[in-house]
Each structure stands twice: as structure tokens, then as C-alpha cells.
Amino acid sequence: MNYLGKTVLVLSCVGLISCSAVPVVTHQTPPTGTTSQAIQSATTKSLVCVAHPGDQANGQERYPGSGAEIGQRVEKAVQQAGWQTVAIKGDAGQSAAECVRRGGTHLLEIRVSHYEDNMTGWSGKPDRIELQLRLSPASQPAQARQVSYEARSNLVASAFAEWGNAKPVALLKGDFDHLVNRLLRDSR
């Protein structure tokens, strides 16, 4: 293969992975709180209401649409774990009632404690996302299990791969999917 052919091959590979964030998981906790047996549903139907967070901000920087993106990504992880989902608004105090009204058996609340989009591929500063997931029976929201997840983008990988600026929500993959699966395991 000549030099031009190798160059085209390398650029094609870079093009395939552009816009993808490479996460460095900085913190994740195993499920804590009420045991999974205590939050089992009495029905065979398992529908998880995913309470989408509001749009995120970091200082003066606002990220329109980020709440929906995070909610959709969490829904995808729940579906990959074998559950059905329905999206609801994450209104404080009203989520459980809305979930029951929509026929949900479980409520999954998302609390984002940090969201920072620094255009890592261009700025050299890592993107960050930190969130907590809280799972409870829709009819008994006080009996909950929860996990935490924190990740930042890998600066070296982002410098080569993130040409189109992946968003912090792109850091929710791999270990995140496994963590959501662990949270949901045995909760049916």
C-alpha cells in the first residue's frame, strides 16, 4: 500500500470515530440503599419511568437540550438491560405520582450534579459529567437504591478523535451501561 493509500485509511478510521468521546471514569458507586428484593414489583409488567432532568448549566454557560439528551441516554441504558421505559418530566415531588398514572412499576430519577462541555477536541479541557441515579418502586418512592457515576473525557484520545466536539452525555457508555444494569438487576 502506498503512502496515499495509508493516509486515506488512517483518515477514514479517524473519521469513523470522530464525534465520539472517550471517557475516563473517575468515580462510580455500587448500588446502595434498600435491597433489590425490597423494591421488587408484585406485577410481571416492568415499566420504568425515567424522570428526565432539566437542561444543564455550568456557571453562565447554558446547555439547551442537555436534559433531554441525558434522559434519552439513560432510557437507552435501561432498555439495554431488558426493561421497557417511558419518559416523564423530573418535577420534584410529582414524579412518582406521574409514574403511577402512566402505569409505571419503577421510577428512575436522574440528578445531574455537574455537566461541563468544554469542546475538548479544540480546547484541551476535559468534558465532565457527574450524576446520581435513584431507583424506587413507583408506589413506594421512599424505598430506593441509588448509584453515582462521574466521568471526564480523555484528553489524549479526544485530541485525536473528537473533531466534531462530542457532548458530555457521550461519556455515558460502557461502564455506565454496566452500572445501570447492576442497579436494575433483580428489581423486577
Language-model-derived ranges and their functions:
Residues 79-99:
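Short beta-strand->alpha-helix linker/helix-N-cap micro-motif
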Residues 56-65, 120-121, 159-166:
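Second-shell loop/turn segments in exported
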Residues 138-188:
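Short secondary-structure boundary motifs at beta->alpha junctions and helix caps
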Residues 92-144, 154, 158:
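Surface-exposed short loop/turn segments
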Residues 71, 75, 130, 173-180:
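Extracytoplasmic/secreted envelope proteins and their assembly/folding machinery
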Residues 1-19:
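Sec-dependent bacterial lipoprotein signal peptides
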Residues 19-81, 183-188:
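A structural "domain/chain start" motif
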Residues 10, 16, 46-47, 96:
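Mature extracytoplasmic/luminal segments of secretory-pathway proteins
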